[in-house]
Regions:
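Cytosolic covalent-transfer regions centered on His/Cys nucleophiles
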Residues: 1-152
């Protein structure tokens, strides 16, 4: 998986305004997946319900969230991963500073194998030295494109 995949599928969203809260952030972060008909809005409600029940499992490392729910969801229409960046960190748990995120990678997959593959590929990509810091510095789709052109 490469960053250019997000750009080629028009799934990059640099949010100009901070989210009101983590629920609002999830709604906004998945906007491109809804717009391009990979998911229905009900999928976001499933993710919100899962976070309310299980805690902020979607924050995989400080600063990065990977919103996803069950693969068997009738609200998933296709397989895709989006990218959204907020200007300020979104707090998921005010008692745990590690449970905040500014970078969101919403996932949708029709196939359980592909879902696990996408999670693994995304996790591997995010372990690239310095990539998270570079993504945090992105302030526009053009910045994102420049990051890709620079070889990230």
């Amino acid at each position: 998986m490469l960053l250019k995949d997000f750009l080629e599928k028009d799934l990059v969203d640099i949010r100009p305004e901070p989210a009101k809260d983590w629920r609002d952030a999830l709604q906004q972060a998945a906007g491109k997946l809804i717009e391009h008909k990979y998911i229905l809005p009900g999928y976001i409600n499933e993710i919100i319900a899962n976070v309310e029940k299980n805690g902020p499992y979607i924050v995989i490392v400080p600063g990065v969230a990977m919103p996803h729910a069950m693969v068997e969801s009738e609200n998933v229409l296709g397989t895709a991963i989006g990218f959204a960046k907020f200007p300020e960190p979104v707090i998921f748990d005010s008692d745990d500073p590690d449970k905040q995120a500014q970078l969101f990678f919403p996932l949708a997959a029709k196939d359980p194998k592909q879902h696990l593959q996408n999670i693994g590929d995304l996790s591997d990509m995010l372990m690239t030295e310095g990539l998270i810091d570079k993504l945090l510095a992105v302030n526009s789709v053009d910045d994102f494109k420049a990051l890709i052109d620079a070889g990230s």
